[in-house]
Swiss-Prot record:
Catalyzes the ADP transfer from ATP to D-glycero-beta-D-manno-heptose 1-phosphate, yielding ADP-D-glycero-beta-D-manno-heptose. In the N-terminal section; belongs to the carbohydrate kinase PfkB family. The active site is at residue 264. This is Bifunctional protein HldE. It comes from the Bacteria.
């Protein structure tokens, strides 16, 4: 079923708030330091990702919406890294440079899929003149459909009331991811998106959903809000609006690896969906689905339109789906960061039979994720003859995607998937039949990358060709 996503390409969103750079150092841990009882990490991979308000803007841009980012930075390598990375994903940056302060940076050291320590490099921007931020907001109000204020209490949003007033006067909704217990600062906002802990720190501990709703409605009245969305981790999220019944949405997360940046994803998808012209209820629906995807990834991350589409169909990227090559490469990269072993196989899979099902189940048991590469219709004709395939590519991929053993499906146009395999480089390449490992397309590339190649047996008596012959014979009787 095709899911109608919002018209993100028509949506314009400005994000104003605390901009930061998230750095990740990865490496193996093999010993304890002789200097202190701490592990020694041999760093072999370094990543830099936009965090805080910058991650919100990334999430908006990843959906195909027009994202503008305003915030405070220093004049340093971190600011340059942020600008470069954000420009690459089409986020329009308009930073206010403060030469007396460093750009806020958070460094995480990870090993064996565990975060060992986080180091923060920052000085609060409190006291910095907010007027340049106000000017940037004023200039953009005529071309945006939503304003996001991303508050991490680092000093960029000391004049929240002025920012809310500017936007509301222009008829632009204001969405705020709050910080701290002083919700008076956010009076008059269109929507606040606290998590449950943040909400209860202001409203008090809630023993039931009824109590949460009652206290949430009181907050809406006390602070003149248009709506309140409480994100509740494994309990999903709850939308509260005056004169409307509460909307409780269960979580769609299938696997949770890291909640870092999940709130950024939620408010980013909310803003982009509202700016595209959808209702708040629809925006919450898409945001809930996106949150279920992003918590299955390690570190601050974003959600693509195809991932969102799969998620609202109940098929999040952490599990299954038909993908393009680029989407598959991203999914494999995320899986590897989680320490998962990726297995890949290929074939026509024209009329799926018990032999195919058994073979794919056995291949899946050899790792954590199974990719199935499928010959296109043209490729199948060249390989099998003009009468094939019996089932077109789209139908073959849909049937494969229904198997529990199959995680990702991708098609290829060539006679063999050698180019595709060389681009993915699975940990294990599997082929069924009487092949020798060295005869399998892509084997040399996989071996050169340190991977494995294996041949599995097909179930005796199962053959698409035999099935077709039997059908033809029966029809001739």
């Amino acid at each position: 079923m095709k899911v109608n996503l919002p018209a993100f390409e028509r949506a314009g969103v400005m994000v104003v708030g605390d901009v930061m750079l998230d750095r990740y150092w990865y490496g193996p841990t093999c010993r304890i330091s002789p200097e202190a009882p701490v592990p020694v990490v041999k760093v072999n991979t370094v990543e830099e990702r936009p965090g805080g308000a910058a991650n919100v803007a990334m999430n908006i841009a990843s959906l195909g919406a027009n994202a503008r980012l305003v915030g405070l930075t220093g004049i340093d390598d971190a600011a340059r890294a942020l600008s470069k990375t954000l420009a690459e994903v089409n986020v329009k940056c308009d930073f206010v440079s403060v030469p007396t302060h460093p750009t806020i940076t958070k460094l995480r050291v990870l090993s064996r899929n565990q975060q060992l320590i986080r180091l923060d490099f920052e000085e609060g921007f409190e006291g910095v003149d907010p007027q340049p931020l106000h000017e940037r907001i004023n200039q953009a109000l005529g071309s945006i459909g939503a304003l996001v204020l991303s508050d991490y209490a680092k000093g960029a949003l000391t004049s929240v009331q002025t920012m809310i007033s500017l936007a509301r006067q222009a008829g632009v909704p204001v969405l705020i991811d709050p910080k701290g217990t002083d919700f008076e600062r956010y009076r008059g906002a269109t929507l606040l998106t606290p998590n449950l802990s943040e909400f209860e720190a202001v409203a008090g501990k809630c023993k039931s959903e009824d109590e949460l709703v009652e206290r949430g409605m009181k907050l809406i009245a006390d602070y003149d809000l248009s709506a309140l969305l409480v994100t509740r981790s494994e309990q999903g999220m709850t939308l509260l609006q005056p004169n409307k019944a509460p909307l409780h949405m269960p979580t769609q997360a299938q696997e949770v690896y890291d909640v870092t940046g999940a709130g950024d994803t939620v408010i980013g998808v909310l803003a982009a969906t509202l700016a595209a012209g959808n209702t708040l209820e629809e925006a919450c629906y898409f945001a809930n689905a996106a949150a279920g995807v992003v918590v299955g990834k390690l570190g601050t991350s974003t959600v693509s339109p195809i991932e969102l589409e799969n998620a609202v169909r109940g098929r999040a990227d952490t599990g299954f789906g038909v993908m393009t090559e680029e989407e598959l490469r991203q999914a494999v990269a995320s899986a590897r960061k989680r320490g998962e072993k990726v297995v890949m196989t290929n074939g026509v899979f024209d009329i799926l039979h018990a032999g195919h099902v058994s073979y794919l189940a056995n291949a899946r048991k050899l790792g954590d994720r199974l990719i199935v590469a499928v010959n296109s219709d043209a490729s199948t004709k060249r390989l099998k003859g003009e009468s094939r395939p019996v089932n077109p590519l789209e139908q073959r991929m849909i049937v494969l995607g229904a198997l529990e053993s199959v995680d990702w499906i991708v098609s290829f146009e060539e006679d063999t998937p050698q180019r595709l395999i060389a681009g993915i480089l699975p940990d294990l390449l599997v082929k069924g039949g009487d092949y020798k490992p060295e005869e399998i397309a892509g084997s040399e590339e996989v071996w050169a990358n340190g991977g494995e190649v294996m041949v599995l047996n097909f179930e005796d008596g199962c053959s698409t060709t035999n099935i077709i012959k039997k059908i033809q014979t029966e029809s001739e009787k």
